[in-house]
């Protein structure tokens, strides 16, 4: 993945609900994408290399086997490289929470993230409301759901990538679409029970952590 994406790395962007996609000091990294070869066999007028297409299919199939979710319709693998001082401040992976249009979109139901190298110092992935810090280890993966069964944002998933103090960090993200899971993870009976406001939910979990 590193060798395939290194020639295509560019400064990473973030989604700003007021200004759209833009560069931000909240996220200091470079990234590139590997796209589904069955949906995008040609990128910028060039056919995807066979080894790249094979790698995508193999890893995507492994993800489906591990999670039981449908990998079709994902955004592709986003490969990120963080240098010294590189970081990603607190954010949610779900997009509906950040979208002020009021239109329900195909949101990021879940995130699959895996580390492509060991980091000398720094670079932990931190979920502050869950009191969890995950050190980057080559070959390790992290998986979590961004949404409740009802489709509402799970505010416990606020997370960040800590600054790199020594070395560099390579990490790959794959966001799994919600709409494609209708026959794999349908809404459950009583799934709309998460009816509290975002602030109520945040206050609840912060109080819970403070009591630990």
Placement of each model-derived feature along the sequence:
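Fe(II)/2-oxoglutarate oxygenase catalytic core
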Residues: 1-143, 147-212
